């Protein structure tokens, strides 16, 4: 089912709360595309995944089975530990570029994911928060600009769909996946370990300088890719010095 709406994703999801739960779940699960008329953009954005990219995702489920992760009473997604490196990266990028969150979600876990975003990324407005049903093409649930934009995600199928649509796919390497030559990548796990070692002996002023250095280091890696938009992002480096 394709949906055309004049609001943002969060407002639409709140409207579903007035429906019986099973009806809302059915509507959500059958969506294949949402067109956001007021948010449609021809300018590039940077879309970033949550599970395994902005937040740790645990192969063992932290004591929950795969099915139990989606039980709303377990609040699995609400309690995921953030990747501090990625939080800093997003915080700095958002000062100079249109940064959005795009996360696949079971309907019953969306509230927990939304609260997680508001806790760790309060600077991201509701207009820049997007959810989509599990297993769908993320390019169909953003601002209509996927072919001009970057997706940072840890899951190959999401990256492949984004790349096929003409966008730039960057793979987040975390604690449970591996690099591939097909995609530019960001090694979240190694960067996280480096950041933690630096922060142990840093005061607030030094931490702010670390944030700038994070951007500088990451962009130097991305610019090696033969992608014009990634090269344009290098302009941020000048503002971080």
Predicted features and spans:
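Charged phosphate-binding loop/patch that engages nucleotide di/tri-phosphates or the phosphate backbone
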Residues: 27-30, 175-200, 206, 210, ...
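Short catalytic/ligand-binding loop motif for oxyanion handling, primarily in non-cytosolic enzymes
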Residues: 55-58, 108-112, 137-140, 158-161, ...
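A structural signal for isolated positions on well-ordered beta-strands in alpha/beta enzyme cores
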Residues: 98-100, 130, 150
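A short, structured active-site edge motif that brings together acidic residues
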Residues: 102-106, 114, 122-140
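Acidic, Mg2+-coordinating phosphoryl-transfer loop and its flanking beta/alpha structural elements
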Residues: 150-188
